[in-house]
């Protein structure tokens, strides 16, 4: 079984990309429902507040995202979203029977801006949590950032820069994001090996082609 945790930015700066985000996410879900193997999905939306809309739902049963759930407002409480999700999933695994703990856990973090609104978690706290889960349990984290230096921000979270990508926060960039995310998830679900560093090459190529600067 694979544990999939999506941390999605729904802050006000995502305005205008709601339909693209919803469509990309649902297309990715549709592809993953057809893949072999069991998976459970958690989806966390963040702005000023944190909202969990899927809590470890079997991939076949995850409902599509709608505009009633995904709408933009507020600031960017990214640390609280990531820290809260790690704490919750970690506790579930801690108290589960060994045979019920997923073999693989993958967090997919997407943001179009820097942290500016968290109240419960700090960079140091979240970095410690991420490093602990990676080292002890082999959890994997990918970080997709727009309008920021994604590699530098990922490092502050304890995520290796090979697992971070800058993307263009527009219709084409968002669609490509979810295509690549789906491919990365397929790779993780199909193999016991860690995700290869070339998971993001299509996003990197698009970012460079369209004038992105690191």
Model-predicted segments: where are they?
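Acidic, low-complexity intrinsically disordered regions
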Residues: 1-214
